[in-house]
Regions:
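N-terminal basic, amphipathic alpha-helical segments
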Residues: 1-131, 137, 331, 335-342, ...
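Active-site PLP attachment segment
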Residues: 71, 296-329, 341-344
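Short glycine-rich anion-binding loops that position phosphate/pyrophosphate groups of nucleotides
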Residues: 115, 244-248, 309, 441
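Conserved core of the PLP fold type I
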Residues: 129, 134-269, 281-282, 287-298, ...
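Helix-loop "lid/cap" segments that line or gate small-molecule binding pockets
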Residues: 155, 319, 347-355
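Hydrophobic beta-strand scaffold residues
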Residues: 217, 273, 422-423
Length: 468
């Protein structure tokens, strides 16, 4: 199958491929259920790196345009395709009904942790983009190497203020989203394979990325205080991947004692710690643990961050903070993957950060999402009494460890989705948990959803008791 893309060499290839594939899906030229060509075939057809195609497919999968069926391949999603009009870095009109962003799926699709698209500061962002185009003039287009110098300074300043991280702009490597960050880390730390230690449970895209890098994967179980240091393996390891602020997916917050223990283990094993701060912008007060990178002194930790939780998928830029000793190697690796950053978007984001508008936007989000989280917790307590939850200190989803009398987690998650909630099942041999998202629903919508779920489970429980 030949793919009808028209690529030019003076624009970022990854961006072009994403936009053109999305357009083919929007227009119906790639029909629902159609099998996509392999990444190797596409890379060969256009003479590009297979990593570039993998990143494009990953982005299309993340946004619901494509879906992967194990042992069969990658296919155009069966979900309804929304109107065209959104490209990377250019927001479409945020829908007023709180529906999913472009390429979003249909009923029953969860995608936990989605931000509310109606909260995106659309007018402000469009003004920033227009101003950036005017200022850049004929230089607008792409920026090379580690990205726009101004944005790297802006991110370093923002991290110092918001996360207490003292880093040099030279340590900031700009990437086109979290997935490219994961691929860059894989190339940087796993050039010849090696042992990669991951959390259990773990985001499947992380495991897939490191497996593709040739890593020998080892999983370490997570409990309510995060990954368990005593279960970390003896002997050498290449990397340890953790999500300490809001474990993905369980929501667990890594305790201060365990943070110190992880760094001690990393020193003994020779591993680099990859700290994914994917939900770091949305925190709800209380005692805040210091980022691993600040505790480490900057030698054994790489810190991944992005703006997607606060700004949604329309602003794709992210970053990796690397130890200063690795900065040159990281820049070289970035050039091999994709030696460009969209100049207009990076200039707009730098202005957003420097003006204080981004900080005000994040503060507003904290208040709105905090009320939604409280509404969800209040509804759970009202119907189910004292509840055990993880992940209430950050992010846009929490884990409810529900009573076994409510049945299987998978069944309860399906019931919750039918009640209008954003839900997924998780858990293991020792626990049952339901992951509940609260980013895209109003307070009233969350309360109504839990009311309906409680009524449904009450009827089921009563029927089961009568049957006995």
């Amino acid at each position: 199958m030949l793919v009808p893309l028209k690529l030019v060499r003076d624009q970022p290839l990854q961006r072009q491929m994403f936009e053109q594939f999305a357009s083919l899906i929007h227009s119906g030229r790639l029909t629902a259920g159609a099998r996509m060509p392999s990444t190797r075939m596409v890379a060969g057809q256009f003479g590009v790196s297979r990593i570039t195609v993998l990143l494009v497919y990953d982005r299309l999968i993340a946004e619901g345009c494509l879906e992967t069926i194990p042992a069969k391949g990658t296919f155009v999603s069966q979900a309804p395709v929304p109107r065209p009009g959104t490209a990377m870095g250019r927001p479409a009109q945020a829908p007023s009904d709180g529906s999913a962003p472009p390429c979003g799926g249909g009923i029953g699709e969860t995608r936990l942790g989605r931000p509310d698209p109606t909260l995106f500061p659309l007018a402000r962002w469009r003004a920033l983009l227009r101003n950036s185009v005017v200022r850049l003039g004929t230089t607008a287009g792409t920026d090379h190497g580690t990205g726009a110098v101004r944005l790297r300074h802006s991110i370093a300043g923002w991290l110092a203020t918001s996360r207490g991280l003292a880093v040099s702009p030279d340590q900031v490597i700009l990437v086109s989203g979290r997935q490219q960050a994961l691929h860059l880390v894989s190339h940087l730390l796993l050039p010849r394979g090696g042992r990669a230690v991951l959390e259990d449970p773990c985001d499947p895209s992380v495991a897939r990325t490191y497996a593709e890098g040739g890593a020998d994967l080892l999983y370490v179980r997570v409990d309510e205080r995060g990954i368990r240091p005593e279960a970390l393996p003896d002997g050498p390891a290449a990397l340890l991947y953790v999500t300490p602020e809001h474990q993905r997916p369980s929501g667990a917050l890594l305790s201060a004692e365990r943070r110190a223990a992880l760094l001690d283990w990393a020193g003994r094993s020779g591993a680099m710690v990859v700290e994914d701060d994917y939900d770091g912008e949305i925190r709800y007060g209380g005692i805040e643990a210091a980022p691993l990178m600040s505790l480490d002194g900057g030698e054994r930790v790489l810190h991944i961050g992005c703006f997607a939780t606060a700004l949604g998928p329309w602003v794709t830029l992210g970053y990796i903070i690397v130890p200063i000793s690795m900065a040159q190697a990281a820049r070289n690796c970035k050039r091999l993957l994709d030696d460009s950053v969209e100049a207009v978007e990076s200039a707009a984001l730098a202005e957003f950060l420097e003006s204080g508008a981004y900080a005000r936007h994040v503060h507003r989000l904290h208040k709105i999402y905090s009320r939604r989280r409280d509404a969800l917790l209040g509804a759970l307590r009202r119907h189910f009494g004292p509840v055990t939850t993880w992940g209430t200190s950050a992010g846009l989803h929490l884990a409810w460890h529900f009573p076994k009398t409510l049945g299987a987690a998978v069944t309860l998650a399906e019931q919750a989705r039918h009640c209008g909630l954003e839900a997924e099942a998780t858990g293991g041999a020792d626990a049952q948990a339901l992951l509940l998202g609260f980013g895209t629903l109003s307070e009233a919508g969350l309360e109504c959803g839990i009311d309906r779920l409680a009524a449904h489970t009450s009827v089921q429980t009563g029927s089961a008791m009568r049957a006995v």
